[in-house]
Amino acid sequence: MAQLKYISGFGNECSSEDPRCPGSLPEGQNNPQVCPYNLYAEQLSGSAFTCPRSTNKRSWLYRIPPSVSHKPFESIDEGHVTHNWDEVDPDPNQLRWKPFEIPKVSQKKVDLVSGLHTLCGAGDIKSNNGLAIHIFLCNTSMENRCFYNSDGDFLIVPQKGNLLIYTEFGKMLVQPNEICVIQRGMRFSIDVFEETRGYILEVYGVHFELPDLGPIGANGLANPRDFLIPVAWYEDRQVPGGYTVIDKYQGKLFAAKQGVSPFNVVAWHGNYTPYKYNLKNFMVINSVAFDHADPSIFTVLTAKSVRPGVAIADFVIFPPRWGVADKTFRPPYYHRNCMSEFMGLIRGHYEAKQGGFLPGGGSLHSTMTPHGPDADCFEKASKAKLAPERIADGTMAFMFESSLSLAVTKWGLKASRCLDENYHKCWEPLKSHFTPNFRNPAEPN
């Protein structure tokens, strides 16, 4: 595969032309009477026209035929995609899933859309407020099929297998330890090269942003220059049997046929684009004196709610770093949280739980449900020599954190057959160390 090219930056005003058609972007205006190369001008809006400039999202696409040229949409089977948060009764228990099983290609060919499974979520699509967490399990590429999401943005986290993603803006190669965001309404198709697995965070009605840095300053965490946007690429391809365009609309799937590939955008400009990011570029902030800092310091992207400082969803990672805090229990502390915490593992192990939490699996600690290090981790960390040490080398755990109370789907609790019924047992060996007559040796007599 030839090396793909990208544009660097987050949320930038960008422009790109396929080099096969120089001068394909109109000069000085968006929709001339006749576009260069006799292309059609089409605007893709990601925000209301009247949003402030700082939040206004739109791009202009110059394409061979316009997107409107298709047959009517018809409802199709949703498979395991759902936005019904009342399928099963609520469950406040700590939940952990073993690695989700990828179907064997010898048994059945499954592409990313067919292999999409909703695990949990909350909120309402029709009012543009909420989120869903999906697992994708696939073994074959999307052939003459593309997908777009009318309901929200997808943040895609591949765990196993590379994704070659065709979009209307160009192509992206996304590998494990990278993420990508495909925003609302953007059509895409994904090629895979092996049995493939990953996680998707979907948010309704908002877009992902870089978190505010506050006293950290102008630089740090995920730096804008490390986000990559594809460059224009098109194919002028007729599809005699029809190309299938799949739309997720109000939580249901619909399909329409058209005669050509939708990836026919010769040039584009704007600030509403797909993008990718390599997690190795995250600049870690950590405590260098004492105590365990709150995990918000590891936020890569946030989707803000209307309440200041409160997110519909945060994407947080736990990257390789130095641990140097003195007089401190260094693993994550025991916690009860007003937020919901879903965790996944791309590779390696998670520092607070060496066993049971495996790559390709997940865990959900719901609102106010207690969680924290397992018994083995507590005993070791309480007695460890506090020398500077590397933490999480060779690993990458992540968290989708939300202010919403997440409901688990029927597939998540039952049909996936991956729920670990023994998860609670990792805390059972925790014992009391209470010493009523304890005296701190540092205190004077």
UniProtKB/Swiss-Prot annotation:
The modification N6-acetyllysine is found at K98. One of its GO terms (biological process) is L-phenylalanine catabolic process. Fe cation binds at H335, E341, H371. It comes from the Eukaryota. The modification N6-succinyllysine is found at K414. One of its GO terms (molecular function) is homogentisate 1,2-dioxygenase activity. Pathway: Amino-acid degradation; L-phenylalanine degradation; acetoacetate and fumarate from L-phenylalanine: step 4/6. One of its GO terms (cellular component) is cytoplasm. Disulfide bonds: none annotated. Keywords: Acetylation, Dioxygenase, Iron, Metal-binding, Oxidoreductase, Phenylalanine catabolism, Tyrosine catabolism. The keyword Ribonucleoprotein does not apply. InterPro entries: HgmA_C, HgmA_N, Homogentis_dOase, RmlC-like_jellyroll, RmlC_Cupin_sf. It catalyses: homogentisate + O2 = 4-maleylacetoacetate + H(+). Its cofactor is Fe cation. Catalyzes the conversion of homogentisate to maleylacetoacetate. Belongs to the homogentisate dioxygenase family. Homohexamer arranged as a dimer of trimers. This is Homogentisate 1,2-dioxygenase. It comes from Pongo abelii.
